[in-house]
Amino acid sequence: INVQNALEAMNEGKKALDEGDYWAALGYYQIVVNDYPNSIFAPEAYYQMSQALVKRGQFMDAFDALQEIVKKYPDYPRFNQIIGAEYDVAATIQSGATPYLWGWFPWFTNYNDAIKIYESVVKDAPYSDYSPIALMNISIIAEQEDKQDVAFDALDRLINNYPKSMFASDAYLQMAKVYRSLVQGPEYDQTPTRNAISFFNDYLILFPNESQVARAEEGLEAMQDTYARSRLVMGDFYYYYRNNG
C-alpha cells in the first residue's frame, strides 16, 4: 500500500470500504493509526476500522478498535457516536450474529462478549442514554445464560442508578421475572417467591399505568398462591411431627 499522507490513506480507505473491500480498507486505516497517531484522522480511522471489522464478523476486534478511541482520544468530539457504535456491536452479538475468526472462519456466538461490551458502555458513559438499556440487555442475556446473579446485579444498578429511565419499570418486572424463574414450588425455600412478590408489588405501586400491569398482576397472583401453599406444607409438616414426635 503506497500513500503519501494520512489524508490520502483515509480517502483510499473510504473508497475500499464503499466497494466492500474490507481487508484493503483495514490496511489503509492501519497506516493512519500506526504512522499518524497524533493526526486529526487517527480516531476516525479507528472508527472506520471498527465498521469494516463488523462487516467481516470480527465483532470483538471491532470493539477493541472503538476502545482505542475511548482510551487514546477521550476528547474526540464524536465520543457519543463511539459509545453508540460499541452498543451496536454488543446488540449484534446479542442478536446471535455469527462471528468469524480472522474474518473468514465461522465461530460460535459468545453472549458473554455482549455482556462485556455492554458493561464497557456503562463504565465509559454512565450518563449516556445507552447505559440504562445496556444494563437491561445484560440482564436479559444473563437470564438466558442461567446467570441469575449477573442479571440481578444489572437490574439493581438500573433501578438504583437510573430511577427516572424509561427502562426502570421494565427493570422491576424483569427482576420479578428472574426471581420467579428460581421458584421451585411450595415445598422448597420461599426466598425467591417472597422476592418475586415484592418486585411485582413494587411494579404495580410505582407504575400503575404501564402496559404490563396485567402481566404483573398475573405474576403476583401466581407467586402469592405458591407462597400460601408453602405455608400449608409447613403447617402439615409441623402438625405431623408434633403429633408423631
What are these regions (language model features)?
Residues I1-G245:
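Acidic, polar-rich low-complexity tracts and alpha-helical solenoid repeat scaffolds
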